[in-house]
């Protein structure tokens, strides 16, 4: 049996830990061919999203990456990003910033 990628487990754990600690988790996502950003940000190299449970809906982390629904300029939009696009997870104020491991 192959070893599973540990990154989705780390990401879910970091998000839950920040949330349980009373922090609002934020995630930095690098733009790339498999990343889906709101149209206003499609030209940005990297975007930081508030992924607190009050800010997004249907946040899902799995072996394919992260997806969540959020409102941008009043319109719902599904953000999608592969695991390799995730740069870091942090608290809102930046006091806690956890770099996310990349695979070659």
Task: Go through each PLM region and give its residues.
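Eukaryotic intrinsically disordered, low-complexity regulatory linkers and tails enriched in Ser/Thr/Pro
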Residues: 1-104
């Amino acid at each position: 049996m192959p070893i599973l990628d540990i990154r989705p487990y780390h990401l879910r754990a970091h998000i839950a830990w920040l949330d349980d600690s009373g922090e609002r988790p934020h995630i930095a996502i690098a733009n790339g061919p498999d990343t889906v950003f709101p149209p206003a940000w499609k030209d940005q190299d990297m975007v930081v999203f508030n992924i607190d449970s009050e800010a997004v809906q249907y946040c899902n982390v799995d072996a394919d990456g992260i997806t969540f629904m959020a409102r941008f300029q009043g319109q719902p939009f599904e953000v999608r990003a592969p695991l390799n696009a995730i740069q870091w997870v942090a608290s809102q104020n930046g006091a806690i910033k956890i770099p996310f491991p990349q695979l070659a």
